[in-house]
């Protein structure tokens, strides 16, 4: 989501927040496709696909989608962080907007508490989200911030990040020992960004939050988004059958691109 109109393509309006939407059924899936398509529309796209809240409201049709917000990189935490004096009023307005767009039974608030040791703000944020939920009578769910499947995959994730930012794990560790800031520091300091077991989730979240999370599963129907391939009719030249013609094209391509270039 962009904070201002997504038509405004300026550095000041380039900051985006995460926004999660699930399709409850096949109609919701088609609606989700419309949202993704519109976010990639050149009129809205700026550095990344995005929509403003007003544009989102224009695109969403019916009550076939589920949405939740509360991840550290999402809209509500951003409002809380940037507006310490009047965040509650802004958050209340946002929750009302989301319930109007998706339906009050289809919008949830989200808590994440899997990495309180290295991310102490998680607990403070979750308490504010729970308070907001009580005021707005909104159900609260719980999720892990899973970037890899198993806890032992943390090292592989760190190596992948090092590859992306063109550095080495040795260099990252040295900088952290020297007290320097490093990109994606939470992933290098913690191994908690995996899919927690039900028992692990129960240790850090309330029973009600876990039940509400399971409720989302029961709200979603099973549906198939895969269609059979739709191939256009194609006539092969010289009355060849498709297998013969494909074989001929492969041989011609091999002769033109490979055979003549072999030392």
Language-model regions, residue ranges each:
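Phosphodiester-processing cores and adjacent nucleic acid-binding clamps
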Residues: 1-263
């Amino acid at each position: 989501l962009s904070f201002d109109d997504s038509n405004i393509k300026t550095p000041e309006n380039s900051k985006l927040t995460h926004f999660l939407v699930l399709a409850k059924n096949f109609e919701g899936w088609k609606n989700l496709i419309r949202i993704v398509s519109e976010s990639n529309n050149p009129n809205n796209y700026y550095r990344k696909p995005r929509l403003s809240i007003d544009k989102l409201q224009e695109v969403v049709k019916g009550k076939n989608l589920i949405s939740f917000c509360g991840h550290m990189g999402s809209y509500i935490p951003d409002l809380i962080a940037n507006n310490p004096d009047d965040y509650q009023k802004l958050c209340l307005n946002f929750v009302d907007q989301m319930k109007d767009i998706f339906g009050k039974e289809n919008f949830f608030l989200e808590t994440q508490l899997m990495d309180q040791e290295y991310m102490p703000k998680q607990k403070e944020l979750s308490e504010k989200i729970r308070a907001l939920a009580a005021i707005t009578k909104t159900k609260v769910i719980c999720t892990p911030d899973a970037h890899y499947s198993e806890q032992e995959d943390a090292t592989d994730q760190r190596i992948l990040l090092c590859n992306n930012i063109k550095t080495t794990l040795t260099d990252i560790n040295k900088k952290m020992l020297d007290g320097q800031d490093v990109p994606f520091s939470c992933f290098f300091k913690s191994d908690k960004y995996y899919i927690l077991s039900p028992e692990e989730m129960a240790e850090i979240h309330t029973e009600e939050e876990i039940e509400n999370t399971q409720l989302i599963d029961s709200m979603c129907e099973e549906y198939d988004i895969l269609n059979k391939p739709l191939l256009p009719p194609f006539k092969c030249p010289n009355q060849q059958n498709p297998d013969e013609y494909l074989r001929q094209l492969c041989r011609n391509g091999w002769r033109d691109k490979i055979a003549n270039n072999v030392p």
